[in-house]
Each structure stands twice: as structure tokens, then as C-alpha cells.
Amino acid sequence: ALTISVEGWDRRGAFCPLLRQISLQPDRLLECRAMTYQVLARKWRPKNFASLVGQEHVVQALSNALDKQRLHHAYLFTGTRGVGKTTLARIVAKALNCETGVTATPCGECSACKQIDAGRFVDLLELDAASNTGIDNMREVIDNAQYAPTAGRFKAYIIDEVHMLSKSAFNAMLKTLEEPPEYLKFVLATTDPQKVPVTVLSRC
């Protein structure tokens, strides 16, 4: 849903703004071939730590952890909307699964990096807690956690707006947060950390 591609003939010029003037002529047809439109925020989203702006202390801490192989099983990213929490989480997923090895400088060229950038990496799960608040949604996530990664080195679970989860969903997640498999990393993101239970905060 991020990209709209338009192919074929367009008599009205609805998707060809530069050619609308010509399209108004009834005796001519316009051909719009593979015109792709993408939201600028998506197009220019940072894809590595070096391209992030304004998060120096966070980047330094994560880079050190990756380079020294001192990785926690769960991270909590907090901040207002649009500061880059989900973007940073995806970069962490790339750093963990880059085919060159666990690194603070993922190559961006290997199959794993490209699939994560495209949102198609099988071992990266992104859950919008605002839309999936219930225990049934969380049970599906936890049930999947028992299986080893299919394509990557680690499974990465990114749970956005985690404070929106129900109390029962938080309780279902606690056991896995306490004793996660070695191959599983949680990245929780929230705009309202005060609403996240203390039992969850203490495990991040």
C-alpha cells in the first residue's frame, strides 16, 4: 500500500500530471508506463546507522553492543511520532541478520538487507499493537517464536505502539520476554512508555 504503480492508457491524465495538457486532446492517447509514486518519507527513510540524524547517543550505544556482541534480548524505543523508532528497529534487524555477520554497518546489498528494506524478510515480524491489541494476536506471535529462524541469524519482532496492548496480551508476552530463545530479539516502540507495565519495562 506504500506504492501505487500505474500502467496502460490514461485518457484523462489523472496519473500523468506532466502530460495532462496533451491528454485533453480527444484524438490522442497517452501511455503511462510503470509510473511509480512513493511517499517521500518512505523513499528517503534511513537504511543504516550512519544516515540517521539526531540520535547520536542511541546509535553509539547500539553500535557498541553490536560490535562487542553484547546484545540484549529486548529493547524499548520511546519518543514522539516520527522520530524514527520503527526505522531504527529495522536497521537493528539488518545489523543482526546481514550476511556479512552481526555488525553495526550492515552492507545493504545482501539478500537479507534488501529483503528487510523491502519488508519481505521472513524472520522479521512487525506488529502494530494499536490494531492488534488482544491476547489472540499475541499468542500467534509467541507460538511462532518457538521456531528457529528460517532465513536469518535472528528473528526480530518489532512491536509498534506497544503500550496499546491489552493487559492479557502483556501477560502472555512476559514469559517469552523473561526466557526468550537465543535467536529471538524484541524491539518494542512506544510514544507513551508510562502505559507500559513495569514488569515489561524491567525486561528491556
Give the positions of each predicted feature.
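P-loop/Walker A NTP-binding region and its immediately flanking N-terminal helices
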Residues: 7-203
